[in-house]
Amino acid sequence: MRYNTFYQVHKALRAMLYETAAELQRTDFNNEEEVNSVLGSITTVVDVFDKHAYNEDHFVFSAVEQYEPSVVDAFEQEHVKDHELSAQLRSLINVYKSLINDEERTQLGSAFRKAFVDFLAFNMVHMAREEDIINNLLWRYYTDDQIRAIERQVISNQTPESTAVVWKWMLRGLSNTEIINWLKAVERNAPQVVFKNLFLTAEKELAGNRFREVVNELQKAA
């Protein structure tokens, strides 16, 4: 099986979309605490997706562009659309800050739900297309080692803060087996401090029974 550079990060992004959509659905827009929480979640989502699109444009798509420029142009145009949907959500956040009327806030909640569904639906289709079309082009023109090298460029471009956010959502979106294999790979190939930070993040993010299973499997492999 060929290496799928989108697999883990897209699982993280889908988990973000699913959980934020559920939070938004149950938010009372006249409850300030609930609104502050969901607006923080939405802000994180659009920030992460904007950064993800930047990385794809500058590292992944650029590797394909020399061979298939028209395909890359089409995907870059999809990223333009994605940024427009992000901007709409950011605009609604700014509108909310100026509202004092309960009825207006309730109406804005409906606008938020529609805008987020549009954002979610677009990105679900977009990511599936990347996993099909872009992956197949990467596999045609590059070896797995070369694809991993591209991925390392993306990783090296991350701040510690953005890495922490992506790790959190990868852990929430991956299966136990996938997490175990990921931790084993990091332990083999990365500095010890990186493994330690990922392990501590797993301890924080995984439910007790899931984390115990992960630890047990790591101990068996030790």
What would you call each of these model-derived segments?
Residues 1-222:
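Small-residue-biased structural context
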